[in-house]
């Protein structure tokens, strides 16, 4: 029985799908005006893990992760770069897809772009206006009337009085209430615009997800996810829009992953501790980064530090070391009655407890090192695959470069190993030791065995 921590109920609840055997999931994706940072990576990896677990349990999964390709930040960045919004967003969408693929994130069922669903957004805004839950302002904007939706604040646990007391921003004179939020923004010179019943303009951010979620998943679906920073106001506003428009529940389970911190400080550009996925992948293998993300429970804070990635690399090394030496070519059906598989399932069914699931893999690796049975290795790979891990050939994993230094490309390493073998055959041990030391200084570890010398690159030894 799967239990999910529902942010709306503030407790773990048994997952009961709206339709038996099917699950519909919507996750807020990127606003594409820059490269993915570690926070984006965490959202992508966490909910990739979630959908993989549902599929492993034979659910028919419809997974939607949107792309926000029209937004104030996008417009501002395009103006700064003196490029079109279309060129800017296309560039960063491609970069996002490359980063996601590197991290082993499977493509969602649907990845809608906001600009392709403006008609859906206009239609929903019209419903809200007709129901007196929204009002056109004199400047051409349309606002949601928060006080007219009785359930506002139920996701965040905030009352309207508390929210008003904490309001510090300059109040827009066109709003009836400081808490009202924009659904439609009147056109400004040089900005993209669409025709609407309220004049030309563009949609607000919050209405985008309500409209796209409904388009692909219906008015009522199972799970909505995203980062903890979106719980308020974005997700709170989505509930107000969708439930206000349709008069019934919008989503049954709300999931929020925790914040990312860097060296125990909030990640931010102003603190100079802001890293893109590409910057991190220049120093650490993609699978190490994925392992690092899943090593923490998705609701816990994720603290990034070089030493944490280095430790994750060493831990992943131990798992791959157990897989070395015995080839398993066929995928196996997981026997959930197996003691290790049963423990793994119990961990994952407890609100996707990946740290406990990984602990099972380490126990299984210990067993594999003792037995060397293909059956155990196949099970280890299959369980790892549920998390998107351990699918590489172990030898290739260990030989992946952690830098682009051509002096130690695989061909060069093999050449040096042959030179070392010749030196040893000639009893020139000084030269053999010199070559080993040279390779060690390049983070390349040699392993001499009965079948010859193999090598691997030490993971996680570079720093940002």
Swiss-Prot record:
Transmembrane segments: none annotated. This is Cysteine--tRNA ligase. It is found in: Cytoplasm. Belongs to the class-I aminoacyl-tRNA synthetase family. Binds 1 zinc ion per subunit. Monomer. It catalyses: tRNA(Cys) + L-cysteine + ATP = L-cysteinyl-tRNA(Cys) + AMP + diphosphate. GO terms for molecular function: ATP binding; cysteine-tRNA ligase activity; zinc ion binding. A motif ('KMSKS' region) lies at residues 266-270. Its main location: cytoplasm. It comes from Nitrosospira multiformis (strain ATCC 25196 / NCIMB 11849 / C 71). A motif ('HIGH' region) lies at residues 30-40. ATP binds at residue 269. PANTHER family: CYSTEINE--TRNA LIGASE, CYTOPLASMIC, CYSTEINYL-TRNA SYNTHETASE. Its cofactor is Zn(2+).
């Amino acid at each position: 029985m799967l239990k999910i921590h529902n942010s709306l109920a503030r407790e773990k609840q048994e997952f009961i799908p709206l339709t038996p055997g099917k699950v519909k999931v919507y996750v807020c994706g990127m606003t594409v005006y820059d490269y993915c940072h570690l926070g984006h990576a965490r959202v992508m990896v966490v909910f990739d893990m979630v959908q993989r677990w549902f599929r492993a349990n034979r659910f028919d999964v419809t997974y939607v992760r949107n792309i926000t390709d029209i937004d104030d930040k996008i417009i501002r960045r395009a103006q700064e770069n003196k490029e079109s919004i279309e060129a800017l967003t296309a560039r960063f969408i491609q970069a996002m897809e490359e980063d996601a693929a590197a991290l082993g994130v499977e493509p969602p069922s649907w990845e809608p772009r906001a600009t392709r669903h403006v008609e859906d957004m206009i239609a929903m805004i019209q419903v809200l206006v007709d129901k007196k839950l929204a009002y056109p302002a004199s400047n051409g904007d349309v606002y949601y009337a928060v006080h007219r939706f009785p359930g506002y604040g139920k996701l965040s646990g905030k009352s309207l009085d508390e929210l008003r007391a904490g309001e510090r921003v300059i109040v827009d004179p066109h709003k009836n209430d400081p808490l009202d939020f924009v659904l439609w923004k009147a056109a400004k010179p040089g900005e993209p615009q669409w025709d609407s019943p309220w004049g030309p303009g563009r949609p607000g951010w919050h209405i985008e997800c309500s409209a796209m979620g409904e388009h692909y998943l219906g008015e009522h679906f199972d799970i909505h996810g995203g980062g903890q920073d979106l719980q308020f106001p974005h997700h709170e506003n989505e509930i107000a829009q969708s439930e206000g428009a349709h008069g019934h529940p919008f989503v049954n389970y709300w999931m929020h992953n925790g914040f990312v911190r860097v060296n125990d400080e909030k990640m931010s550009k102003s603190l100079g501790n802001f890293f893109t996925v590409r910057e991190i992948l220049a120093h650490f293998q993609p699978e190490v980064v994925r392992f690092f993300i899943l090593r923490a429970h998705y609701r816990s804070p994720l603290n990034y530090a070089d030493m944490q990635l280095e430790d994750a690399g060493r831990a992943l090394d131990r798992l791959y070391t157990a897989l070395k030496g015995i080839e398993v070519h066929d995928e196996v059906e997981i026997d959930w009655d197996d003691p290790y598989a049963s423990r793994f399932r119990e961990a994952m069914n407890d609100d996707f407890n990946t740290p406990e699931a990984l602990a099972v893999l380490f126990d299984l690796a210990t067993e594999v090192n003792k037995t060397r049975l293909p059956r155990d290795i196949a099970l280890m790979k299959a369980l790892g695959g549920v998390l998107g891990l351990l699918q590489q050939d172990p030898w290739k994993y260990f030989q992946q470069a952690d830098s682009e230094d051509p002096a130690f490309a695989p061909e060069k390493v093999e050449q040096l190993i042959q030179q070392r073998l010749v030196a040893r055959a000639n009893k020139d041990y000084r030269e053999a030791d010199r070559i080993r030391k040279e390779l060690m200084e390049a983070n390349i570890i040699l392993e001499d065995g009965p079948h010859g010398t193999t090598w691997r690159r030490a993971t996680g030894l570079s720093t940002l």
